[in-house]
Design a protein with these regions (language model features):
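Well-ordered beta-sheet/strand-loop patches within structured domains
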Residues: 1-196
Length: 196
């Protein structure tokens, strides 16, 4: 990646399809749904590149967080991508060419940005700090007949899929139509601020 060149995840990786060997895994979709789709989970790679870019102090030109928190990086360190709508992009904002080395081992994605570190930055290294600035409880809505509360929260089923939890007027909780015998407290969503 030459100085001033922009990296686009979607342009480099291309569309994720079964024909290209991408397996099906869960993706977050518009409206809060999560469904299996070819290339699901590839956001983990985009998020790892994003983190590397932050530590390298490169200029990020396009990045969007997921609609839900993810577990594979700290809050605010994720980068979601979706073919045709969401991309992750950054610019080589150094004065020297750089390359991206990517590998997988032991179930982990490793990203190295290899290049010449600028000498005029005035610091030796970068520390990322996270601060929770607010928490928001799960949204609840009562349907027309006031018997079902929807969007009471989400949970992961035995396959790792996100499922909605429905609570009836008596406080009974259901997941995928089956009554569950345990209490569930919905995950809170946290607003955060990142510092570089």
């Amino acid at each position: 990646l030459n100085p001033g060149d922009e990296f686009s995840f979607n342009k480099i990786v291309g569309e994720r399809t079964p024909e290209k060997g991408y397996q099906s895994a869960i993706v977050y979709q518009t409206g809060g749904k999560s469904e299996a789709e070819a290339g699901g989970g590839v956001c983990q790679v985009a998020s790892t590149i994003y983190t590397a870019c932050l530590y390298a102090d490169l200029k990020v030109t396009e990045r969007a967080p997921h609609m839900f928190t993810v577990t594979y990086v700290q809050l605010g360190m994720d980068a979601t991508i979706y073919w045709g709508s969401l991309d992750y992009k950054f610019v080589n904002s150094t004065d020297h060419p750089m390359r991206i080395d990517a590998s997988v081992s032991g179930g982990y994605v490793h990203i190295k940005l290899v290049g010449t570190a600028p000498k005029d930055k005035g610091y030796d290294h970068i520390v990322l700090r996270h601060e929770v600035v607010a928490t928001v409880q799960p949204k609840m809505e009562i349907d027309g007949d006031k018997t079902i509360i929807t969007d009471a929260g989400t949970a992961l089923d035995e396959n790792g899929n996100t499922v909605n939890i429905v609570v009836d007027k008596d406080g009974n909780k259901y997941i995928k139509g089956d009554m569950v015998q345990y209490s569930y407290v919905g995950k809170t969503v946290m607003a955060y601020r990142d510092y570089v």
